[in-house]
Design a protein with these regions (language model features):
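Flexible "cap/lid" loop of the alpha/beta hydrolase fold
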Residues: 149, 158-191
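Catalytic histidine-centered segment of alpha/beta-hydrolase-like enzymes
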Residues: 300-309
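Gly/Ala-rich beta-loop-alpha elbow adjacent to hydrolase catalytic centers
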Residues: 136, 140, 144
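Conserved HGGG/HGGXW glycine-rich cap/lid loop of the alpha/beta-hydrolase fold
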Residues: 53-102
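Alpha/beta-hydrolase fold catalytic core
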Residues: 1-65, 88-90, 129-130, 321-325
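Active-site loop/oxyanion-hole signature of alpha/beta-hydrolase fold enzymes
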Residues: 52-59, 94-135
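Conserved alpha/beta-hydrolase catalytic His-Asp/Glu region
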Residues: 30-31, 194-260
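Conserved loop-alpha-helix segment in the C-terminal half of the alpha/beta-hydrolase fold
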Residues: 267-300
Length: 325
């Protein structure tokens, strides 16, 4: 017979876990009610993909813009200030990366960053897009670079907004393998503890994300920030982080491909006050490693698509116009 103390402890743990799960479920549904889908879905071999598709190319030579958000982001990071402006001259497609926003992987598909790179080609084939310019913010920048390296005939240019270009810290292969083997742990955390904790700390976390810029008052709804409270989105972010070391090291090892003749043009914008990714270790380092033109900096933080849309639009237009020639 188990001791009374052990029985009480186990019962308390079960009650706490169920309470956290119910709380997470309620918060997830509330977030989805506040921030409903803003676009449409397409069925691809690997994913049921939610995207915003607006605008029309001003000429037959103009490429289509595909916008790729960062870690735990969603299409609203671009629809907040960028898409309407860009859609006046280009066809603009902003995607929810599977697991984020309202996109999801199909059953049996491995949830890898390389699969997200392959997704760019799937989108282009499905929508019959011949040449695209990729716009990547933060982790989305790394995915855009991976796609440019893998599909140079498809990608006509890359516009990077505060991109992740290499690992911020060194991760040992042993630690990376251990993290990859603990998916069950991330599932448990995302479905119980993570959402309630993030809800309590969300103001502080958002301030850190935007610093030193102010967080827009309507970021939670119009910027899609409340969707980050969903358990599925948190799990996708955990999986992205776990997969990042091995995948990004491989992408970095192929950066020389971006210096070869006929490679896609790469341009970059970085905030000198970025508190999430280092402008020097990520931006200046990459600009020196690869032929980045132009490489622009400004006095701003990390969330450039929401806080500095005019500068973002200018950079994207320059890349897209160059790809049209």
């Amino acid at each position: 017979m188990p001791s009374p103390f052990l029985s009480i402890t186990l019962a308390a743990l079960v009650i706490a876990t169920v309470t956290l799960w119910v709380t997470t479920t309620v918060l997830t549904r509330r977030a989805e009610a506040r921030v409903p889908p803003a676009g449409r879905w397409i069925d691809l071999p690997s994913a049921h993909l939610h995207l915003i598709d607006r605008g029309q190319a001003a000429s037959a030579q103009a490429p289509v813009l595909i916008l790729i958000h960062g870690l735990a982001g969603q299409t609203q990071h671009f629809s907040y200030r960028l898409i309407d402006e860009l859609a006046q001259s280009y066809r603009v497609i902003a995607i929810d990366r599977p697991g984020s926003g309202y996109s999801r992987w199909r059953a049996g598909v491995r949830h890898t960053l390389e699969a997200q790179v392959a997704l760019i080609d799937e989108i282009a084939r499905h929508l019959d897009l011949q040449r695209v310019v990729l716009v990547g913010h933060s982790l989305g920048g790394a995915i855009a670079l991976g796609a440019a390296i893998r599909y140079p005939d498809r990608v006509a240019g890359v516009a990077l907004l505060a991109p992740l270009t290499r690992l911020p810290i060194e991760v040992s292969p042993r630690l990376a393998r251990w993290l990859a083997s603990t998916d069950w742990l991330w599932r448990f955390v995302s479905q119980t503890i993570a959402t309630p904790m993030l809800r309590v700390r969300r103001q502080r976390l958002r301030a850190d994300l935007f610093a030193p810029d102010a967080v827009p008052a309507d970021y939670g709804v119009q910027g899609g920030g409340d969707l980050t409270l969903r358990s599925g989105q948190l799990l996708a972010a955990c999986r992205d982080l776990v997969a990042l070391p091995a995948w990004l090291d491989h992408v970095v090892s192929r950066y020389d491909d971006l210096r070869s003749p006929g490679c896609p043009a790469v341009a970059m914008l970085y905030g000198l006050q970025d508190a999430v990714l280092s402008p020097s270790l990520q931006g200046a380092w990459f600009a020196e490693r690869v032929q980045v033109s132009p490489y622009r900096t400004l006095d701003a933080g990390h969330m450039l698509p929401l806080t500095r849309p005019e500068a973002c639009v200018q950079l994207i237009r320059q890349v897209a116009d160059g790809a049209s020639r």
